[in-house]
Amino acid sequence: MVDKSQETTHFGFQTVAKEQKADMVAHVFHSVASKYDVMNDLMSFGIHRLWKRFTIDCSGVRRGQTVLDLAGGTGDLTAKFSRMVGETGKVVLADINESMLKMGREKLRNIGVIGNVEYVQANAEALPFPDNTFDCITISFGLRNVTEKEKALRSMYRVLKPGGRLLVLEFSKPIIEPLSKAYDAYSFHILPRIGSLVANDADSYRYLAESIRMHPDQDTLKAMMEDAGFESVDYYNLTAGVVALHRGYKF
């Protein structure tokens, strides 16, 4: 019998016990929740809004459908999906982190997004929904923080309806070498300083940079999605591969 307490994974560049990672990631997001939106704009120079807009455009979401915005954080995608599905549809904003979920709920209610949105604290590895529930699932800048990504992908596949699609928007591997070097310099030297100045938390943004480097590259993630059961999997490199959008279907 395997002693699960001895199984390890990565937390950034650190090797930690699998059972510890979720709590460590939770600490990061409890720490940054109040400055999350501000830091997203600063870190990406606002480009994250274009990446999310492209994800919305690729989602195929229509009026009356049911959408899961997983690791939905402060609700950027949920706000858009709420308008797209209308009164006859539903969006579930799910996040494992209570602080992020609270920020998302407050933000969306303040801008009038109510009525067709539900909020659920959920672990991506064991989604608390029946089989074949959602027409579309998105996970935006969240998969790299999941301890067992393969398990999470299988869980997402289970709760998708036949004909449904999963979209994974995540930091990836730059495809242009000079950009890769500049990106490394920015990530490891400038990003933690911004985190220190704005959020008073350099360590969390150092973890961000490290977690990006440990995340599977474009083709590896595509293969992982296929192994989980998804078909017709493809991906789009955005900003020369700094970010990639993967899309797969359940048939």
From Swiss-Prot:
Biological process per Gene Ontology, one example term: methylation
Pathway: Quinol/quinone metabolism; menaquinone biosynthesis; menaquinol from 1,4-dihydroxy-2-naphthoate: step 2/2; Cofactor biosynthesis; ubiquinone biosynthesis
Reactions catalysed: a 2-demethylmenaquinol + S-adenosyl-L-methionine = a menaquinol + S-adenosyl-L-homocysteine + H(+); a 2-methoxy-6-(all-trans-polyprenyl)benzene-1,4-diol + S-adenosyl-L-methionine = a 5-methoxy-2-methyl-3-(all-trans-polyprenyl)benzene-1,4-diol + S-adenosyl-L-homocysteine + H(+)
Family annotation (PROSITE patterns): SAM_MT_UBIE, UBIE_1, UBIE_2
Pfam family, one: Ubie_methyltran
MF (Gene Ontology): 2-methoxy-6-polyprenyl-1,4-benzoquinol methyltransferase activity; demethylmenaquinone methyltransferase activity
Keywords of this entry: Menaquinone biosynthesis, Methyltransferase, S-adenosyl-L-methionine, Transferase, Ubiquinone biosynthesis
First-tier enzyme category under EC: transferase
EC number(s) given by UniProt: 2.1.1.163, 2.1.1.201
Residues annotated to bind S-adenosyl-L-methionine: 74, 95, 123-124, 140
Membership in a protein family: Belongs to the class I-like SAM-binding methyltransferase superfamily. MenG/UbiE family.
NCBIfam families hit by this protein: MenG_MenH_UbiE, PRK00216.1-1, PRK00216.1-3, PRK00216.1-5
Function statement: Methyltransferase required for the conversion of demethylmenaquinol (DMKH2) to menaquinol (MKH2) and the conversion of 2-polyprenyl-6-methoxy-1,4-benzoquinol (DDMQH2) to 2-polyprenyl-3-methyl-6-methoxy-1,4-benzoquinol (DMQH2).
Name of this chain's protein: Ubiquinone/menaquinone biosynthesis C-methyltransferase UbiE
Organism: Escherichia fergusonii (strain ATCC 35469 / DSM 13698 / CCUG 18766 / IAM 14443 / JCM 21226 / LMG 7866 / NBRC 102419 / NCTC 12128 / CDC 0568-73)
